[in-house]
Amino acid sequence: MEIFDYDNILLLPRKCRVESRSECDTSVELGERRFRLPVVPANMKTVVDEKICTWLAQNGYFYVMHRFDLDNVQFVKDMHAQGCFASISLGVKQPDYDTVDRFVAEGICPEYITIDIAHGHADSVKNMITYLKAKIPAAFVIAGNVGTPEAVIDLENWGADATKVGIGPGKVCITKLKTGFGTGGWQLSALKWCARVATKPIIADGGIRSHGDIAKSVRFGATMVMVGSLFAGHEESPGKTVEVDGELYKEYYGSASDFNKGEYKHVEGKRILEPIKGKLADTLTEMEQDIQSSISYSGGKKLMDIRKVNYVILGGDNAGEHLLM
């Protein structure tokens, strides 16, 4: 098995077949909807809030609302009232089951539900998927997070419509340091490994440090890429604004950090400060243009043409050119 990550992989270009990069289509289908980009902001309190999710939905982007200090039922009602699709997060505890029961009682169905726990290959996730499929079968269920082919196979067999791959590769995640487990440092390899057995979409979650990493994720099997740090630190971001030596920053912390939990218990996340980057819309436009460029380098016109390219591994035992596999 090849072990590599984003920083030691480069994709190999093929003959360009478009007159302009603007001809390239970056859109992707997930469930019954098509979205402008294969990118979704991380469902974290310092990355998304109700206002940002509404704007994303209204402008053709996918989103997943976080599950912390939120009335999910009211959120879904509010999104539907504005003509937007609803995409929420659930855990696997009793209050999450109570939320599902409220959806049923009020005749409400969120279009997307992400079962979002740190170690998603678990009986507790199996039970929640089963419950969701029985109670609100129309919802598209994303389950995670996982990092092995066995986990992807199980989640799909349990009824998940998509899986979220990535255990601890994120910028504010310290799972590998605290536990000795995870995909940090080899997230791209883990994605490739999992994609080989997947029959349903994969959302690659974590480890993205540049826009080129999005193309690499698509090449190795991702339908959608969840991004935290690149979306944190915008003017609209919900994180607290902090001034340091005359420079403005936004707080960005992991969902399993003590800052998010409000207590120091089972902590696997940390807090950092992200320099304020400007407006979210400008970053999304730049992302779209960069992914269009990636598609043009792949010799194609559509996003999934990126999957047809070869790649090289830089350094290490697996260094050299790797033909399409």
From Swiss-Prot:
Keyword tags: NADP, Oxidoreductase
E.C. number(s) listed in UniProt: 1.7.1.7
Active site per UniProt: 173
CDD domains found in the cross-reference section: IMPDH (cd00381)
Keyword Nuclease found: no
Catalytic reaction annotation: IMP + NH4(+) + NADP(+) = GMP + NADPH + 2 H(+)
Regions that span the bilayer: none
GO CC annotation: cytosol; GMP reductase complex
Keyword presence, Oxidoreductase: yes
SMART domains registered for this protein in UniProt: IMPDH
GO molecular function: GMP reductase activity
A biological-process GO annotation: purine nucleotide metabolic process
Top-level EC class: oxidoreductase
Positions with a binding annotation for NADP(+): 202-225
Family from the record: Belongs to the IMPDH/GMPR family. GuaC type 2 subfamily.
PANTHER family in UniProt: GMP REDUCTASE
Record's function text: Catalyzes the irreversible NADPH-dependent deamination of GMP to IMP. It functions in the conversion of nucleobase, nucleoside and nucleotide derivatives of G to A nucleotides, and in maintaining the intracellular balance of A and G nucleotides.
Protein name according to UniProt: GMP reductase
Organism, scientific name: Acidovorax sp. (strain JS42)
Name of the gene encoding the protein in the UniProt record: guaC
